[in-house]
């Protein structure tokens, strides 16, 4: 009899304890519930729900405190406060306004079990890149991003979060030492070129991809910072700019006619060695073609001279970037 009474007295406490354990499990393991709606809702349903939440504007009166009740156990979440987006003393930081909800959208009923979706970012997000980027662009609207719409990255459905990290002390893509690693995680062909024997000093962090390119888009074909390829090259190689008294058309028109800007197995990042490189244009007058015959059975008919001896146009035409010498018409001096 005493044991049965004792059990009756313990039951309410047991029920309360189990209920509290269930609630605590939501808070202690936020990663298990943070995007549980993905398994139950299609991407279209997620977007429709988010649109409805924004229309209702049901933001939490407690701001980040509401979010941290569950998410403070996540190291990734808390790393936000180590970076600029989590700065509480900056008027430009999300923390100065709607805080977490400035990026992830209104809380709504999300904290009632975590079933109602929030905006998520990155590869695991079911939201389109356009939807994700619209959140970032609502703040980041400076002149460097004026050409984002229609840029190479925009047309490839690249999300801001594909390159940028927010919940970190320092975004790797904004560091000169790690920017190239971020870019070449997608641009693998360029990475291979950068590791060839002749290349720009990106491997040693003496320059970065953004020294030449604007990743947010520009009016040029390769999203360059300057209006043209040549203007981009001249920003470092000013001695090649000209105008020269005697000019070489490939130099004035397009540097990449001869050079591979990301790297090459040939000296000076040339696409191929001379004379083959020169013969791509100078093949009809017979002069340059004669040198090539030296590698065939007809080589004995070419004759011995400085040109055929080294089989390089550069033995004579040394000033290929142009000449200011009065008698430099043939770019020989």
From Swiss-Prot:
Q: Which domain of life is it from?
A: Bacteria
Q: Give the UniProt keywords, A-Z.
A: Signal
Listed SUPFAM superfamilies = Multiheme cytochromes
Which InterPro entries does the record match to this protein?
A: Cytochrom_c_NrfB-like_dom, Decahaem_cyt-c_DmsE, Multihaem_cyt_sf, Multiheme_Cytochr_ET, Paired_CXXCH_1
The record's listing under PROSITE patterns reads:
MULTIHEME_CYTC
Q: Name one GO molecular function term.
A: oxidoreductase activity
Pfam families with a match to the protein in the record? Cytochrom_c_NrfB-like, Paired_CXXCH_1
The signal peptide stretch is: 1-34
For this protein, the parts annotated as crossing the membrane are: none
Q: What is this protein called?
A: Multiheme cytochrome MtrA
Species this chain originates from: Shewanella baltica (strain OS185)
Taxonomic lineage from the root: Bacteria, Pseudomonadati, Pseudomonadota, Gammaproteobacteria, Alteromonadales
């Amino acid at each position: 009899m005493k044991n049965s009474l004792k059990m009756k007295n313990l039951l309410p406490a047991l029920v309360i304890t189990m209920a509290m354990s269930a609630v605590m499990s939501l808070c202690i393991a936020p990663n298990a519930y943070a995007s549980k709606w993905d398994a139950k809702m299609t991407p279209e349903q997620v977007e429709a729900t988010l649109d409805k939440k924004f229309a209702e504007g049901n933001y939490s009166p407690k701001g980040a405190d509401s979010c941290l009740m569950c998410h403070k156990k996540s190291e990734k979440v808390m790393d936000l406060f180590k970076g600029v987006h989590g700065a509480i003393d900056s008027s430009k930081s999300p923390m100065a306004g709607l805080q977490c909800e400035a990026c992830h959208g209104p809380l709504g009923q999300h904290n009632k079990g975590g079933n109602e979706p929030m905006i998520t970012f990155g590869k695991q997000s079911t939201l389109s890149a356009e939807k994700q980027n619209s959140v970032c662009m609502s703040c980041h609207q400076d002149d460097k991003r004026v050409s984002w719409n229609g840029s190479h990255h925009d047309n490839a459905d690249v999300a801001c979060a594909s390159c940028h990290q927010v919940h970190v002390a320092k975004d790797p893509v904004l560091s000169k030492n790690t920017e190239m690693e971020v870019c070449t995680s997608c641009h693998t062909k360029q990475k291979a070129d950068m590791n060839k024997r002749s290349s720009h000093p990106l491997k040693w962090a003496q320059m970065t991809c953004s020294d030449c390119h604007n990743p947010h888009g520009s009016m040029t074909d390769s999203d360059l910072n300057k209006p043209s390829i040549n203007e981009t090259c001249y920003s470092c190689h000013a001695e090649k700019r000209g105008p020269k008294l005697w000019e070489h058309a490939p130099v004035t028109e397009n540097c990449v006619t001869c050079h591979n800007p990301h790297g090459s197995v040939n000296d000076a990042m040339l696409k191929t060695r001379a004379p083959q490189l020169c013969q791509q244009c100078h093949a009809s007058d017979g002069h340059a073609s004669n040198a090539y015959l030296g590698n065939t059975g007809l080589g004995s008919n070419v004759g011995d001279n400085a040109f055929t001896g080294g089989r390089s146009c550069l033995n004579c035409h040394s000033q290929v970037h142009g000449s200011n010498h009065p008698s430099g018409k043939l770019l020989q001096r």
